Amino acid sequence: MNKIKYLGGLMAMVFLAACSSTPVIEDKPSSEFEGLNKVSSSGFSEAWARPGTNLSMYGSIKATPLKSADAEIVQPGQSIQTRVQRDMEMTPEIEQGLADNWDRAITAAADKAGLSTDGSGDKVLRIDSTMTRIAPSANFAAESSTPGRSTVYTEDSGEASIEFKLYDDASGELLAVVRDKRRVGSQIWSRSNSVTASADVRNLYNTWATRLVSRITGQ
């Protein structure tokens, strides 16, 4: 058995009932991130954190704009192992839309938890967010070029993967890394369209933001 260490605010509470066990830092150093150890039962797909860090001491966050330009894109109907570079183009408009959705989600979650979002104060936590993979189950870029409200049948709106890196803003020290992969949407074989897909993305970002903030504050 690995000796277990608890990590302040990041590990203090579980946000969703599905996450029944308390997240903990193990004595298992990351081979990818120097100084960070593996976190188990985090509520995310993967997580690493610096032992001894108390994220609940941070009363302010500074969320940098979400990046998505280099996200791996898997086309609808293609193998999950297939890497597609630009068949579904990640346009500046899509990038900005994703960034705007994330900014609204993390700001709302932080405000609700009583965290400042202007980056002021002595203890500021910087959050860098990057979309790493997008696998839509319908080509909404193509559908959006068709006049009117296009409808497609799809299992849901696809899936997406994201990475969060948490830094002490003053020192630049990396405190934690979180990676997560989620299905977008919840209805099996539902009618879906570009409007629904956008709503699913907003809901996904809200879920990510709320859970991340709960790990920071321990509330």
Residue ranges and their predicted role:
Residues 15-18:
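C-terminal motif of bacterial Sec signal peptides marking the signal peptidase cleavage site
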Residues 20-99, 216-219:
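A structural "domain/chain start" motif
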Residues 85-99, 114-116, 191-199:
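Second-shell loop/turn segments in exported
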Residues 108-173, 190-191, 195:
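Surface-exposed short loop/turn segments
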